[in-house]
Structures are given as structure tokens and as C-alpha cells.
Amino acid sequence: MKIIVTGGTGFVGGPLLSRLVAAGHEIILLTRNPDSARSRLDRQIRIEPWDGKVAGSWVQHVDGADAVLNLAGENIGGKRWTAVQKERIIGSRVDGTRAIVASIGKAMKKPVALVNASAVGFYGSVEDGDVAEDHPRGNSFLSETVDQWVEANFPLSFKSPQNRHSKP
């Protein structure tokens, strides 16, 4: 499969890229730091620069891709949540997702899947038991961030009947 990945140098993306390459998939990584990525990642991975916010030369690869895995986002545990840091956390998810959704909308042969990885923090504090998709949302900054992130994906809900996640 031809898979486009954002956030491929992060906590989830790094190990995932290794597995995808080992499984024989063609990987195109969109990254803010191409030189750093090239020095650390498998040479089979095609690396394309991306500012994480707007469409760029990478959009040509969306046409004909089988899937887009959007793992990009400011580290939520890396710094204190000041007003500026909260804007970075939200913007890194929402702006990039909007650019990806727009590029998918323009593709002649659209990917079958767009996967956005969010976190269990959406559900707030859970004292006991398991958390499933139908669990009530939390009332926190992370819950609101995920709401905005889902909203950025929502245009695809009307164009792709395979979209499984609805607005919370």
C-alpha cells in the first residue's frame, strides 16, 4: 500500500513507520524536519517537507495513496500549558488536518482511509472500567481540542461513507 504519514518521528509514528516498512508498504513521510528524519529513518521512506499547516508539494502524493495516517501534533506533555502552548497544541492538529482534508478533496483517486490518532484524554478522568467510543466526553482542554480536530475532518464525512467517526 502507498501510505502517507504525518507525525512519523514522534512517540507513535516512529515505531509504526518501522513496522509499515517491514511489511513492505510504500511510505511517504510529511515532516517539518526533513534532514533530521533522513538521518534517523529507513532509507526506503520517501521524505517530503511540510510545515504542518498548509498544502505544499506533498499534495501530489495524496492522489493515488491508499491511506493517510495523521499522527502529527505538538507534544501535550512536553511543556506547561500556557495560552501560547495551548494554541500550538490545537493548531498543530486542526490546521494540518484541514490541509490534509482539502488535499484529499482535490485528489482524483482518493485514499480509502484517513486515520487521525487522538488520545483517551478526550474522555476526561475515568475512575473505573474501560473506555469505549460511546463513553461521554470529558470537560477539559483536551476534550475541546479533539472536538475542534474532529470538526476539521467533518467535511469528509459527507464525501466518504466509510467515515466511521462522527462528531462527538
Give the ranges of each region predicted by the language model:
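Active-site Tyr-X1-5-Lys
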Residues: N139-S166
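NAD(P)H-binding glycine-rich loop region in Rossmannoid oxidoreductase-like domains
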Residues: D35, S39-A99
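N-terminal Rossmann NAD(P)H-binding glycine-rich loop of SDR-like oxidoreductase domains
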Residues: I3-A23
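SDR active-site strand-loop-helix element
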Residues: T6, L30, L71-A72, L114-V120, ...
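Conserved Rossmann-fold NAD(P)-dependent oxidoreductase catalytic core, especially the SDR/UDP-sugar
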Residues: K86-R88, T97-S140
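Conserved glycine-rich Rossmann-like NAD(P)H-binding loop of the short-chain dehydrogenase/reductase
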Residues: H25-R32
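Rossmann-fold NAD(P)-dependent oxidoreductase module
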Residues: P15, R19, S103, A152
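Residues at the starts of beta-strands that form the adenosine-phosphate
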Residues: K2, E26, A113, Q162
